[in-house]
Amino acid sequence: MKKFIITIILGLLISSSVLARSTGCKEGNCDNGYGKWVYTDKTTYEWEWVKTKKHGKGIETWPNGYIYTGEFKNSVWSGQGILAFPDGSTYDGEWANGFMNGQGTFTWADGKKKSGIWKNGKLQE
């Protein structure tokens, strides 16, 4: 399961490359302020922007059902956040450099939970 989670997160990070999928700002101010950016694959990012980067709080939504709601730093998931998976599973906790890093809880769709300290996407047991 750990490899599955890491694979999904790495896939999301790779697929979220701004340069590979940029379309444009569709609402608000995506330079410095609050705005909505839509990518060519229909992935969206809404909320805070600083110097054209996702920075502060935001919501990133993929057409395949993944939704990240939380903090960004220089367009990377960093701080507190929740990643919701299409199957209903979630990770709620700390992020750094785009990975689960710090205290967090992974909850499977069936309600089973694993909590603890995560490092680079892996639960430290």
Q: Where do the protein language model's features map onto the residues?
A:
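Bacterial N-terminal signal peptides
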Residues: 7-15
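Positively charged n-region of N-terminal signal peptides that target proteins for export
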Residues: 1-4
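Glycine/tyrosine- and acidic-biased, solvent-exposed loop/turn segments at the edges of beta-strands
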Residues: 15-125
